[in-house]
Amino acid sequence: MAHDPRLSSAGTATPNPPPPPPPPPPEPSTTGTGETQAAEPSAPAQSSDSFKLKFCTVCASNQNRSMEAHLRLSTAPSPFPVISFGTGSLVRLPGPSITQPNVYNFNTTSYSQMYDELLAKDERLYRNNGLLNMLDRNRNLKWGPERFQDWVPGMPRVDHVSKGDKGALGTEGGTVDVIITCEERCWDAVVDDLMNKGAALNRPVHVFNVDIRDNHEEALVGGKAILELATRLNDAATQERKIHGAEGWENGNGEARRSFDERVPEILASWQEKWPNLPALWTLAWL
């Protein structure tokens, strides 16, 4: 305050009739301006807090385990961008007997179509075995099951936003940071397919497998565990971006990305200690 030029000028003006009233009004405005300027840099920090890794969940038919994980991630208190797939050649759902499954095509058959068909075939059977409840959940999450091998990384997915798919916001660019499969054979299929696709984007992606038995009860537990793993990974990514900046992140390089990649094995090991009944695998692959 003693160094404020307005106060010194007010001191020189003491003999004159206009006394020091002018200095007090500007004084708060000066400090107010300083506070505003100090508050502005905090805005980017808030935006970095809202950073979200993009996830992909995968099971055999994109029906039970991957969709429970899709639900958990897309409807979390702080939702994640998420897409989901199956790795099978066809979508297979239980039928009246083991030798009579209900079989559908990926990408062209909606969950609503499956629901209506099974409802018409035998409502009592498919209500009791949980298929109708599962399909009802699925059709409220996205349009229909997609096959992982048909996915082209980097191809825009804007139509999924317009369809109202849960978790679609943030995935419009057709890329993900993390893929989580729910069965080892699905993990093998994903890793093999990524190699066959040739890494056209040269973008790193962490591929995990969380081994979940294919029933509704185990899928519920597995979905909760996958959400926790996703949250731990996202917290670490956010920390590294705050420390090192986000430069190069989207291209899969930069100091923040390198530091995050190095932390992933430790994060998985810590998570596995809490979920010992869900054996996990991990590798780094490329889109």
Swiss-Prot record:
**Keywords assigned by UniProt?**
Hydrolase, mRNA processing, Nucleus, Protein phosphatase
Compartment(s) where it occurs, according to its Swiss-Prot or TrEMBL record: Nucleus
Q: Does the keyword Oxidoreductase apply?
A: no
Cysteine-cysteine disulfides? none
Highest taxon in the source lineage:
Eukaryota
Question: What are its GO biological-process terms?
Answer: intracellular phosphate ion homeostasis; mRNA 3'-end processing; positive regulation of telomere maintenance via semi-conservative replication; regulation of pericentric heterochromatin formation; regulation of siRNA-independent facultative heterochromatin formation; sno(s)RNA transcription; termination of RNA polymerase II transcription; termination of RNA polymerase II transcription, exosome-dependent
For molecular function, the Gene Ontology terms on record are:
protein tyrosine phosphatase activity; RNA polymerase II CTD heptapeptide repeat phosphatase activity; RNA polymerase II CTD heptapeptide repeat S5 phosphatase activity
Q: Where is the composition biased (Pro residues)?
A: 15-28
Compositional bias segments (type: Low complexity): 29-47
Q: Where is this region: Disordered?
A: 1-47
For the keyword Hydrolase, the answer is yes
Top enzyme class, one word, equals hydrolase
Q: Which reaction does it catalyse?
A: O-phospho-L-seryl-[protein] + H2O = L-seryl-[protein] + phosphate; O-phospho-L-threonyl-[protein] + H2O = L-threonyl-[protein] + phosphate
Entry EC number(s): 3.1.3.16
| Listed GO CC annotations | chromatin; mRNA cleavage and polyadenylation specificity factor complex
Subunit structure of this chain's protein: Component of the cleavage and polyadenylation factor (CPF) complex.
Q: Which family does it belong to?
A: Belongs to the SSU72 phosphatase family.
What does the protein in this record do? Component of the cleavage and polyadenylation factor (CPF) complex, which plays a key role in polyadenylation-dependent pre-mRNA 3'-end formation and cooperates with cleavage factors including the CFIA complex and NAB4/CFIB. Ssu72 is required for 3'-end formation of snoRNAs.
This chain belongs to the protein called RNA polymerase II subunit A C-terminal domain phosphatase ssu72
Ranked from the top, the taxonomy reads:
Eukaryota, Fungi, Dikarya, Ascomycota, Pezizomycotina
